Amino acid sequence: MPNAPKRRDVLKYAGATGAAATAFGLPLAQPAAAAEPETFRVRGRAPLDTVVFGDADSEAAHHLDATLSDVVTGGLGQPARVLNPSTPATYWGGTLKFDVTVRPTGTTYVTVRLWGDDHDDTSEEAGSGTNMWRLQLFCEGKQVGYEDQGAVDSLDILDTAPRTPGRFFFHTLPLPERMTAGRNKVTLEIRSMGRIWSYGQDASQLYRTMTTPSRGIYRLYTHTDPYFEAPRGEVQGTAPTATVRTGGEEVMDAIRARVQKDQKNLLTTATPATMDGWAMQSLAEGYLWPGSPAHQDPQAVERVLMAIDGRYMAWQADATVLTGSDQQWQGFGRVGLVLALLWEHLGDRLDGQVTGSPYAIANPGFESGGATPTAWQMPGWATAGGGTWARDTTVRRSGTASLKLQVTSASGYSYVNSAPRTRITPGTYRYGAWIRTDGVTGAGAHIDPLFFDASGKLVGSDHKVYASKGTHDWEYVEFVFATPTGATQLELHLRLSGPGTAWFDDITLVAPTDTTVPVPPPRRDAYVDMLRSSRDYWRRHFPHYSNQAQICAIGLYQTNRGLRLLAPELALPEDRARDYLYQSIGMVPYLGPEDQDGNPTRPLGADYYQVTRAGLTRELGYVGSYGEVIDWLVMMYESVTRGYQGQEAPELRDHMVMMTKARGRFRVVDVDKDHHRISRIETVIGWRNEVYPGETAYASRTAWDSNPVMSAAVFKDPEIVGWTQEMVADGQLYPQLNLQATHPWTRVGLNALRFLSRDWDGFQSLAARPARIPTAWDQPDFVLTDEQNGCVAVKNGEELFFASLYFRSRQGVNNYARIHHVTPVDQRSATIREHSAGTTDSTFTARDWVLWDYAINDPGASHLPPGGFPPPGDTLHQALAGDVYRLAPVPDDVPDPTLGVHFDGVETMLVGRAPFYLCEYGDYLIAMNTSTDRTCVLPARLDFGPARDLVTGKMIGAGKRPRLGPLSTLVLYRGDAG
């Protein structure tokens, strides 16, 4: 593939390049395609141009051409324009086209002014809003940047939470230098568009129709300094006074009700064979929790094992149950975990056969179930008959229950069928049932097997066999029939047509005598097969993205733990099993998938760590929500410590606490839509699927597997406990629990159960701690630098400064930095130009793509075209196409930074992170050395002037040229230099 970075093309950082950097200081490499090198500028230059939308004079002066647009009065009484949906509605909405002044040399920036209270109110915060519209910038008819997850991104992405309540905020993007070179004016365009679902598997799933007006667009500025400073006199707004949120306690009652309902359903009604891993674990946890109806109920243990049986049978029929199920990279890990939790309560159950043979009718005696029996259902179309069905424990032929059907009207009926379908083979089968009746008239009670082919098509029906009418005791009815041609599966229907009551029990299915039906193995053997196969498969497919690696490592440890109980001779030694955990969280180098002999392949060399020295995950750089892996850390820790023969793991806990605390430096404390104090995840500088503002988070956040108090309850670290107690004091606990109360997914049900049964009580028992979120204005200043992720977090008085110097740089060094600057008054987000050095002579050329600037690094994603599916409508072209990015050097022992995935433009490891960065934004200058073996010397900074080193507090003169050793960063601030 042309211009795609491959291992043989990536030169090593050594020799003359390194010597030049060491001897002569950090070169100021010009940005890709820039007309001339940048020089450092003095902060405070006025904008080149300002367009005031909704102001007739300004719009006329800039030759505004508006389509599908209205002028509105918006925040603080300021004029703005909204862009309306088209008729009929499509992905694209209204547009604003206008002329602006630019600089003919260097980089011209565009900044848009937006009102911070605007948000999509169609969903709860952090939910999937339907009106999360976007604004995209175009220059001279070409799209500037990418519609989703590009370094140069959309002009705006609306979220379900307001970004800066009561104030305006600013977003800055660079115009391509080639489009402004030699020109004083260009034509820009803002196009509105619908929502994008980044995980869509085709264009219709990706691109959603815009159906309501966009947010208000207030002003657009052009300027030459990366830091935008609004002209004096512009109305900005002030931060609302933060208050404490009150109320919301009723969500706790909703969670209690939900958990009780879930537990009762799992114990009595749900079909065990079709339970997923979360349901399986939920029932096991319920058996151990005194608050559950399943507590110490032997039926719960049996149903958990039946769920494992069902997973085993499903895997025997479909190998992807292991390799591509809803458990993803965890494989059959929960099977091992559940066995460890229940080990002392299993008795001799593991000696029995696996239940749920696909060749047998499940629950033939209706022994399992609650109000209705498991593995039986009334089809939706049958509800029109007006009849009822129930599991009756007062009438039975044998065992403890039967199926009761009842009809009251002459034309009524009640039909029930077995589910799932039962496999059959050619030959003559005997189908039977015992039926008892009371006052039955009309057609009466009967059985009726329905036959289907492998695709689910009905190929045989109307084989009714009736019991006697009237009132009588148990009567056996039987149907002997040769399997219809093409039939491979059946549903056995039990029916009552006409008034009366009928009971069914002891359903029989007898296969032909000359048919060999597979006999299920003993549970112990089946479970060993499951656990060993899962462990060994995922050892050979240990993924490289950090969150995937963590999930996989959890599964590897859990399956091995199950083997340690079932077949100790097949289990890996504890230190070997725990090593996967260590690799996944950066305690030791990540060694990658293993070969058939168990030898690590080291695809990223011998010294790649999944978590940085600063405690952040790598995907490839800093990520916001994706980096909040505390739920996986807790799951990993408890996979070792809970259950039979659980072990202490202080080394894991200490490292996980460090990682959790690192995330605490990436928080923004502000107010929510109701002006209540809140802490949010820093997402502006993140690489993947970010929303602005970030989700609520103090220590732990709410997610599918996470609740807000879990890390405090489990780790009990004083700082983490203090942050979590701060969340409760702010009144922000209850709003985060709506997910656990309302979402029906079994995964969330397990989350709700752990919150109610363990985390909430455990958290409440902890002593009060004084620690508070580090980024609050009343907390001490700090500087966190992460050279491996190329990012910094700074608290400097009443300023927060977040920067990603290695930002969405997927195939080469793009020389874009991402900035988020926060004060009590305003917020700025920006993609700006920066300088880098130490790159190789190999290059990657940006493609003419508009959705993504990359291809997904996953061999299973070949159905997704590189760059993503084009949006609907006319063909668009990328203004950045043709930009040339130099590749960073990679270590000698990395055989292929694409990891064997050679799609055009594939996201590639390591080649986008430059050895050296120099970035200026406002009063901040960052010099970062990401190399492991080189020292660089900073150039003189006469235009920037003297500045304070925010780590040491020392002043550094403009002419001083400090040296930066390997993996070190200098953060200079000139705002108080005199």
Annotate each predicted stretch with a short phrase:
Residues 37-71, 225, 233, 356-384, ...:
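Extracellular carbohydrate-recognition regions
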Residues 2-3, 9-30:
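N-terminal export signals
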Residues 68-92, 390-411:
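Short carbohydrate-recognition loop motifs
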Residues 144-177, 457-486:
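Extracellular carbohydrate recognition and processing domains
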Residues 97, 644-946:
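Extended polysaccharide-engagement surfaces of secreted carbohydrate-active enzymes
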Residues 313-345, 353-355, 522-772, 782, ...:
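Extracellular polysaccharide-recognition and catalytic grooves
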Residues 102-127, 427-437:
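A short beta-strand element within beta-rich, extracytoplasmic domains
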Residues 356-518:
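Extracellular and organelle-lumenal recognition/adhesion modules and their flexible linkers in secreted
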